Amino acid sequence: GGGSGGHITPLLPLARALKSKDPTCQLIYIGLRGEKIAVAQSFQSVFNKTARINSGKFRRYHGESWLSHLLDVKTLVLNFLDMFKVIAGSFQAYRLLGKYKPAVIFSKGGFVVVPVGMAARLRRIPIVTHDSDAAAGLANRIVGRWASLHATGMPPRYYPYAKDTIIQTGIPVDEHIKPVNTGLQAQLKRQIGLPPDGLMLLVT
């Protein structure tokens, strides 16, 4: 997982489903050093172990010209320094994978998966990626070149991977999240002062 909930929270329902099918399976979460979410009780109750490694990210700002990128000295310096974090994280991940000897690596994306993917490649551990968005993230595109299988939230045509390696699985959703019918939608809209037949757009 990465440093945001978008990469991490889908891991919980997946982990619970795996535990339900095989209570003896051992699940290890490798996250970014310094993140707070993995210490939550919800994580501690489903993962057998949690570990943290260093990693760096490649900062890029869509819509800017190449000249703007070249003149953005601060970003260039930060990207250069973060390369060393990726290298350090790769050594840390290599040691962790040697210690725990996992059967498979599941990559949900986020820049922390790059060192783990590199270490898994060196240790010849199979990798499975999952992309929730219609566009694969940079980290999964990097790790994806070594992956055996790509699970996706959207149809295969949206992804750059070999088509025979893609399975559209949808997005893991917590079992406590239930579908909402139109009647309940109308009721909830009235509660917050919206017309029951009005269109509501949620931006997160």
Predicted ranges, named:
Residues 195-204:
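Conserved donor-binding/catalytic core segment of Leloir-type glycosyltransferases
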Residues 7-19:
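Short amphipathic alpha-helix
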Residues 25-28, 34, 121-183, 194:
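Active-site-proximal region of nucleotide-activated glycan assembly enzymes
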Residues 1-4, 19-82, 169-172:
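Conserved nucleotide-sugar phosphate-binding/catalytic loop shared by glycosyltransferases and other
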Residues 19, 44-46, 91-106, 113-128, ...:
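Glycosyltransferases and closely related glycan-assembly transferases
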Residues 1-8, 105-107:
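Short, glycine-rich nucleotide/cofactor-binding loops
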